[in-house]
């Protein structure tokens, strides 16, 4: 198994430009899909790129990482229907205005277009698109993933004005019942993403993060106890 130590990637001009273009779009983003999420995806994507046995266009990958979720704030407020479709188009226009070569723009757009785990998302065909997908999904695993997914539950609950899930375990003998998901939804969401990973380095990193989530949930169940009194 590879050793995943600290890896600092030096951003190239395309990645730096994309960051400058992307950051203002995240001003109204909620924590699960803000510029810090984009930054983590960027860093993990480049980390994975250094461990694949393929030549990776790191500029394309870095740019796509910064731009992939710029439509999230607008989708959340129903200003647009699909953040992926919107971000793909918007990114193309932004990069074209900066004189970026058409081939690079199309490569970045493919990464953005295929980064979602939604059933409607097309398959990632290039190594850059696969690495972006993997890095994005890994951000929903491990300690970061527990935090992000809890944020997403809060976001969805606020948007629907109904509890999306509760911080409890409905397998326990409770005096209350509910038809929402319980805390195990964190594990379910993470597993769906781990099973979809494309690259070997991502799968190895995902296995480590999965172990942490098992430890977290075990501690959670221990803390609430069967009757929630411990």
Feature map (PLM): residue ranges:
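Short alpha-helical hairpin
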Residues: 6-23
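His-Asp-centered metal-binding catalytic motifs of divalent-metal-dependent phosphohydrolases/nucleases
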Residues: 58-77, 83, 87, 91, ...
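Divalent metal-dependent phosphate-bond-processing catalytic cores, especially two-metal-ion Mg2+/Mn2+ enzymes
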Residues: 2-9, 29-35, 40-54, 67, ...
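An active-site-proximal "capping" alpha-helix that borders the catalytic cofactor pocket
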Residues: 41-42, 46, 82-96
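Short amphipathic alpha-helical interaction patches enriched in hydrophobic/aromatic residues
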Residues: 26-29, 49, 70-75, 95, ...
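Hydrophobic, well-structured mid-protein blocks that either form specific transmembrane helices
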Residues: 94-130
């Amino acid at each position: 198994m590879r050793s995943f130590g600290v890896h600092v990637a030096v951003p190239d001009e395309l990645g730096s430009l994309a960051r400058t273009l992307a950051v203002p779009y995240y001003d109204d983003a909620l924590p699960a899909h803000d510029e810090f999420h984009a930054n983590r995806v960027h860093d993990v994507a480049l980390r994975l790129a250094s461990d694949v046995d393929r030549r990776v266009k790191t500029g394309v990958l870095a740019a796509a990482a910064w731009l992939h979720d710029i439509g999230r704030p607008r989708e959340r407020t129903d200003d647009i229907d699909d953040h992926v479709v919107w971000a793909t188009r918007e990114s193309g226009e932004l990069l074209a205005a900066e004189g970026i070569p058409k081939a690079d723009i199309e490569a970045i757009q493919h990464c953005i277009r295929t980064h979602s785990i939604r059933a409607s998302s097309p398959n990632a065909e290039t190594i850059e698109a696969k690495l972006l997908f993997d890095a994005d999904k890994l951000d929903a695993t491990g300690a970061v993933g527990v935090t992000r997914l809890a944020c997403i539950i809060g976001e969805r609950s606020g948007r629907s004005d109904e509890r999306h899930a509760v911080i409890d375990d409905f397998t326990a003998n409770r005096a209350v019942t509910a038809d929402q998901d319980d805390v195990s939804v964190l594990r379910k969401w993470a597993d769906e993403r781990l099973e979809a990973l494309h690259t070997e380095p991502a799968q190895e990193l995902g296995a480590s993060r999965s172990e942490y989530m098992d430890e977290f949930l075990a501690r959670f169940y221990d803390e609430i106890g069967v009757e929630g009194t411990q």
